[in-house]
Amino acid sequence: MREGTGEPSNYWALNEFVIERSGSAGLISIRVMADGIHLNDYWADGLIISTPTGSTAYSMSVGGPIVAPGADVVILTPLAPHSLTVRPIVLPSSTVIEAQVIRDDQPYVLAYDGRSRSFERGGEPIRFRFSRASHVVNLVKLPEQHYFQTLRSKLMWGVLRHG
């Protein structure tokens, strides 16, 4: 959900939300609260908030963990953070995550499962609240295929290559 001085807006995603800078110059600063407690101020190109389903997409490509689909968690993965000590973190899916761009001299984008919304620099302060939806998505699971088999075949996970 996006909150500013106007009406709150709701966005839904199965894989991930990404708050990232728009354009090529500068970093953005994102303050993150977890259940109302200050978690971190990320000084980075952006931040990925992903589900286990989304963990093998953008989050994995920037160093986030692979998370099995049945895990009841949410993953926060910074995009090119300015500090070497900032790492991805895995939180319970019941955690309400609030994020706000606190240094808004750069335009930024909220992307969610291939869609996006742009925000200009110096606009109204906007707080994004991420929480688990009350509804469930049922996915087809083929009995002859297991998640680990898919990881090995599609991502070449754990495959040794000798030259």
Positions of the model-derived regions?
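Catalytic phosphate-donor-binding core of small-molecule kinases
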Residues: 1-47, 56-163
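Oxyanion-binding "anion nests"
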Residues: 53
